[in-house]
């Protein structure tokens, strides 16, 4: 979120939606807790506003209301302000029963839904393995995001999958191992 606050906040929101979708639920509401440094610093205030506008834009697109939230400013240490930290919770409704994953077997297929791009900016991989902070941040294509979530919900509803996991922190390798 600190490299591109708008896309970072949207990415947090989308990940929360994907987590709900992976249970077979349709996202219907969102709550947020936005944590930032001193808003009297113009750069920090700009970061906050960009994050807020990104969340608003994605919520309007998905028609998901923000039903509650909290903003926490002045989060700083002697070394300076914290990185912008949007925390997003999404609520969903399940039509019948929750999707309960079952163990996979040899011979089962692994299906990847969505596109991958060369967007590792701001990742822990870059920061901790390569000691690099920067790069191109992941961005969310709103239409593709919605189409992908609807596809996953359809697969779950039609009992065509044994388990579903979103790809987020740790990337593909962590998603597969979990």
Go through the PLM ranges and name each one:
Residues 1-178:
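Glycine/proline-enriched, intrinsically flexible loops and inter-domain linkers
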């Amino acid at each position: 979120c600190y490299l591109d606050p708008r896309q970072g906040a949207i990415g947090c929101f989308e990940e929360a939606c994907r987590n709900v979708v992976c249970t077979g639920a349709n996202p219907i509401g969102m709550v947020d807790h936005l944590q930032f440094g001193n808003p009297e610093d113009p750069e920090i205030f700009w970061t906050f506003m960009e994050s807020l506008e990104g969340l608003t834009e994605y919520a309007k697109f998905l028609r998901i209301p923000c039903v509650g939230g909290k903003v926490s400013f002045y989060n700083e240490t002697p070394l300076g302000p914290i990185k912008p930290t949007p925390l997003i919770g999404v609520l969903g409704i399940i039509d019948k029963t929750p999707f309960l994953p079952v163990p996979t077997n040899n011979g089962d297929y692994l299906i990847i839904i969505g596109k991958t791009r060369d967007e590792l900016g701001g990742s822990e991989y870059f920061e901790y393995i390569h000691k690099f902070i920067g790069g191109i941040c992941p961005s969310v294509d709103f239409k593709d995001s919605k189409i992908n979530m609807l596809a996953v919900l359809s697969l779950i509803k039609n009992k065509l999958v044994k388990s579903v996991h979103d790809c987020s922190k740790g990337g593909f390798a962590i998603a597969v191992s979990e």
